[in-house]
Amino acid sequence: MLSFKKIEQSDINELKKYYDYDECMGCDTNLLNAYLWRNEYNIKFAFYDDTIVKVYCNPDESVWGYCMPTGKNIKGALEEVFKDAEERNGNLQIVMLTNGNRAMLETMFPGKFDYVRSPENQDYIYTSRDLATLAGKRFHAKRNHISKFYRTYTDTRFETLSDSNITDALTVAKLWCAENDTDPEASSEITAIREMCDLKDEYNVKGAVLYVDSKPVAMTLGSEISPKVYDINFEKALREYDGVYAVINNEFAKTLTQYEYINREEDMGLEGLKKSKLSYNPVIILDRWNAIPKKR
């Protein structure tokens, strides 16, 4: 069987060597992301012939989803994945496939899999220019929303993340959790946000805090997927301030124009979140698929 281990901070830079970041756009290829959510989603990886295999495990440590291997011997690693699944429990599912991954898998193993779309996991990707400028008729409503915010709240301040305002960013995140106490992700998000702030200097983490009347009311954190794609890992705001999400989104995008694209991640199957992400006119919706062996 493959020997899986949980991702540690010391693994992040080593694992990056196996990804072709000229092609990567998905948030699942952001290894800082994998590290931050390692406990919540029990994310592990194994090496095989200069190739890595990432998996998601159940609480009992059984594997529920294999990711597409990446490295020099993808086909060989997939054959090893098939053996591994059979030796463990016979539960083979390859998850989070992009259209490109799906095509590669089908070419390597024609007719072996059925493919099930996973829309709740698709990434919404925008040009940084669109989010920073909100130019044109498509963004008319967004510009109006932001203008209304600034007319309503006259004492506002936007600060990029620094040692002096990390506490304020965490304060917003905690207040957001208190407003959303039915969200099972809440406590794990606070842990991940705190860890991400601690690692900001080492992994090119950027962020921002928005203030109204000197009170922190919104925060955001992001990290680099590739030299052309930036990932928005977290964005939290206090809902009593109408327009606050539009403002923090727009102001932070203005600091990211050196990147061609901004990935605002998935909608998790939440209709309200889906509507919000679509309202910003993504230029790419990165499809996701799960591959399940055909029944013989």
What kind of feature is each model-predicted range?
Residues 1-49, 185-188, 201:
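Amide-forming acyltransferase catalytic core, primarily the GNAT-like/NAT-type
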Residues 4-5, 26-28, 45, 111-117, ...:
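Short secondary-structure junctions
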Residues 29-101, 211-239:
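Conserved donor-binding loop and adjoining core beta-sheet/short helix segment
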Residues 93-95, 159, 261-264:
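Short catalytic-loop micro-motif centered on adjacent basic/acidic residues
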Residues 102-116, 144, 269-285:
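Conserved active-site alpha-helix within GNAT-family acetyltransferase domains
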Residues 111-182:
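Acyltransferase donor/substrate-recognition loop-hinge adjacent to the catalytic core
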Residues 163, 167-229:
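A mid-sequence, solvent-exposed acidic-amphipathic segment
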Residues 207-294:
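Aromatic (often tryptophan-rich) hydrophobic motifs at membrane interfaces
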